[in-house]
Amino acid sequence: MTDFDTKKLNKKWTIEDSISTYGIDKWGEKYFSINSEGNISISPDNKSQKKIDLFKLVKEFKSREINTPLIIRFNDILKDRIAELNNAFSQAIETYDYKNIYKGVFPIKCNQQRNVLEKIIEYGDRWNFGLEVGSKSELLIGLSILENQKSLLICNGYKDKKYIETAILARKLGKHPIIVIEQRDEVKRIIEAVKDLKATPILGIRSKLSSKSSGRWSKSVGDNSKFGLSIPEIMLTIKELKEANLINEMMLLHFHVGSQISDISVIKDALQEASQIFVELSKLGAPMKYIDVGGGLGIDFDGTKMSSNTSTNYSLQNYANDVIATVKDSCEVNNIQHPIIISESGRAIISHCSVLIFNILGTSHVSSQVKVSDQKKQSLIITNLIETLNQIKNLRDKKEDLSEIIELWNDAKKFKEDCLVAFRLGFICLEERAYAEELTWACAKEIANQLENNEIIHPDLSEITDTLASTYYANLSVFKSIPDTWAINQVFPIIPIHRHLEEPFCKGHFADLTCDSDGKLNNFIDNGKIKSLLNLHPPEKNNDYLIGIFMAGAYQEALGNFHNLFGNTNVIHIDINEDNSYKIKNIIKENSKSEILELLDYSSDNLVESIRVNTESAINNKTLTIQEARKLIDQIETSLRKSSYLSE
């Protein structure tokens, strides 16, 4: 019997069981589902019949020597997300008879990859979709790839004089940059730049709202927020712009109430406050034309549609309706022309289109099999543990309440602690300690088997599940590919991409390749709650066990680092054809070890030469043969050209 044989597969396991276990029917929306073969299926929208089998896709990539870990970017999903956002605002504008338009922008910081931004511009062109930049580097990207002169380029972030001058001069190229004043000292720089260049900008102002936010980033807004002007600072800025004859260039109000806002009431409150500020700025003589509602449009990571860190209590259409209706009401009450609505919705656009796939390298787990000790005379601790295990087994066919099981489990834990103390003092040997641990695990497994049908586990017994959990070793760096799970405990949908016709009877979590205890994935979505273990299958010999992390297209690639020198993974951009085939549009190859070392100023040639010199010394000292030296150098040179991740 193998370590995973403690429970036989349930032959009646169905796809519906897998759907219920992983909740993919909730968080998967129209994009992700399980097909009749038990594999994850990708659909770009609900209007066409296009579908692609994710597991088969990854296997085909492997045949092309494009190995895991890898990111697959589905261009069709990105296209659909952009259309969904723009259509939602179009519908709201029609419903509320709004007398202006919506012009969205994508915040480059969410995903700066060139292939991503080019697709966003391509797919958004029909709506004059623009970009938002937050640094001089991002400004250069925006100016170089945004060709549509009707598209907006919102200029946020800290701005020195060069940033401001670049944005002002870009207007002469036919671009449409709007410089958003976020710090008081930017006003002086803008005035100086206008005088020096004898050119005028389009200006906006970012307000710090008093409205409270919700979710993980709720503390990033308000009086102590990093960006924006207080109301007194806004009044002073308006005064200075009037004195500099620049008030006629002030056309935009911007605000931001945090990312991934979970509660729609927060958005409504912020909109009401901001709309009134917009009205007042108009009354002060600024020809206000735009209101930028910032980011914050959340996505539903767990599918519960509730206000939480992993969900939202509103839909995309709810959001658009509230933005349009609130701004309209404030303007009409004050006889102000309806402004152009701008939003900076990054996460909602880019998250769904990227799927991160990794393979499992191996597992470790607690064995419930007890090996008979060779010790002729057993210590009292061992005897007590054997007796406890037998007492637990004797409860199998009895209907006592849980109190007896709890008592016996506490006894087993106490005997194990006694064993550790005895070992420290030298009273028992290493073999006896190993035997005691095996007996304790066997007690835990026996209790787990007896309680497997209990829907609610007593708190005193809940630790047993963690005790018996398996660790699945992932060919992945958490710090490189999915850093938000480590940095802010963000929870993403994680699910095997195949074998959904089999029962995932193992409970486990993931450990990554890095030599860091934080390199793990142990928070998983569970119907609105977070659980520490995921239902998984036992890996099969000679077959990859493939896991997908979904809805992780925002921020992760930009925030990832080279911890332990694990580099970028392969990234493949694909289009799904009408016949359910696919076309690879772009392949961004993973970093080789040589490329990673070069980033840290290590020359691969120098590295090889240094080792070669060492081999010469070893040959002279007769500790290494010439053949061994050649083999070592060959392996090092080959390794430098290969991936930093593990391969077969």
From Swiss-Prot:
It comes from the Bacteria. The modification N6-(pyridoxal phosphate)lysine is found at K109. It is an enzyme of class 4 (lyase). Substrate binds at I291, D292, V293, G294, G295, G296, L297, G298, I299, D300, F301. The keyword NADP does not apply. Its EC number is 4.1.1.19. GO terms for molecular function: arginine decarboxylase activity; metal ion binding. GO terms for biological process: arginine catabolic process; spermidine biosynthetic process. Its cofactor is Mg(2+); pyridoxal 5'-phosphate. Keywords: Decarboxylase, Lyase, Magnesium, Metal-binding, Polyamine biosynthesis, Pyridoxal phosphate, Spermidine biosynthesis. Pfam families: Arg_decarb_HB (PF17810), Arg_decarbox_C (PF17944), Orn_Arg_deC_N (PF02784). The keyword Metal-binding applies. Catalyzes the biosynthesis of agmatine from arginine. HAMAP family: SpeA. This is Biosynthetic arginine decarboxylase. The lineage of its organism: Bacteria, Bacillati, Cyanobacteriota, Cyanophyceae, Synechococcales.
